[in-house]
Amino acid sequence: MNIKQYLDSTYLKTASQAGLSEADNTIVAEKFIQEAIEECFKLIMIRPDIVSIAKKKITDANSNLQIGTVIDFPEGKSSVDEKISEAIQAIEDGADDLDFVCNYEAFKNGSIDLVKDEVLKCTLLGLENNKVVKWIIEVAALNDKQIIQLSALIKNVVISNFKEELYQSVFVKSSTGFYKTEGDLPNGATIPSIIMMLENASPLPVKAAGGVRSYKEAVEMIRLGVKRIGTSVAKAIADGQNSQIDY
C-alpha cells in the first residue's frame, strides 16, 4: 500500500487561528506545499487565497501534486451563487479539487430542496471543469440519522444527474476539522461515522478528514474503504509516526 497516495496534506488555518501575521502564515502554507511536493503526496489542501501560490510552486517543481481548496469554509451557510463564485475563482487559480462545505444547518432545519440544489449546481460546475468535487457534511454537527440521510441525499443527487463514470469524482467528506464540539467530543472522522458514510454514500467515494493522526488510524480508515484522508500531519503518518495535533 502506498499510503502517500491516499493523503491530502492539509493546512487550512487563517493567520489569526495560527496566531501569525498574514505573511508568516503564508510561509507556513508554503512549507506544507513544499513538503507535499517532496513527499509525493496525493494532494495539498489549502485555503483559496493560497491556491495560485501552490500552482506556481508545483509547476516550477514539475510535480504531479494536486491542489485542493475549500469552498464556503467552514460553516457552509453561503448561498449557492456565492459558493459557485468562490469555486470559479478557485478553478481559475488552478485548483484540482473543490471541497464544498454542505449547508448542513439548512439540512438539519428541513431545507432539503436548498441542499439538493446546491449539491447539483456546485457538483455540475466542478465536473464540467474536470475537477474532483467533495461535499463536507460535518459529522460532528449531525446525529447518526442525519449522517445517513445527508450522505444518501448527496449520493442520490449525483446518481440521478450524472453519468456513472463520474461517480468517483464526487466524494462525501466527513469534516472541516474546525467544528467546535462540547467537551472532549471528537470533531472529525470517527470509525462509526465513516462506516455510516461508506454504507450510505456508495458508490460515491468517501474522504475521512480530521482526527486521523497516526499511520495505524490511517490504515484502519483505508481498510474500511475510504479513498482519501485529510490530515495536517501527512508526513508523520507516512513515516509511521503518531501525532497529537488536532487536525
Question: Where do the PLM segments sit?
Answer:
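Glycine-rich, proline-tolerant flexible connector loops at the mouths of alpha/beta enzymes
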Residues: I33-I53, K57, L98-K116, E138, ...
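Hydrophobic faces of well-ordered beta-strands that scaffold small-molecule active sites
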Residues: N2-T14, I44-I46, L65-D72, L98-F100, ...
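Alpha-helix-loop-beta-strand connector modules within alpha/beta enzyme cores
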Residues: P48, S52-F73, I112-K134, A141, ...
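Alpha/beta catalytic cores of nucleotide-metabolism and tRNA/nucleoside-modifying enzymes
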Residues: M1-K31, L124, M196-L204, V212-Y247
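Glycine-rich anion/phosphate-binding loops
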Residues: P74-Q89, N109-L120
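Catalytic cores of alpha/beta
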Residues: S78-E92, L142-L153, M196-L204, V212-R228
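Conserved N-terminal beta1-alpha1 strand-loop-helix module at the mouth
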Residues: M1-V80, E92, L153
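Glycine-rich phosphate-binding active-site loops on the catalytic face of alpha/beta enzymes
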Residues: Y11, T69-I71, E92-F107, V158-D184, ...
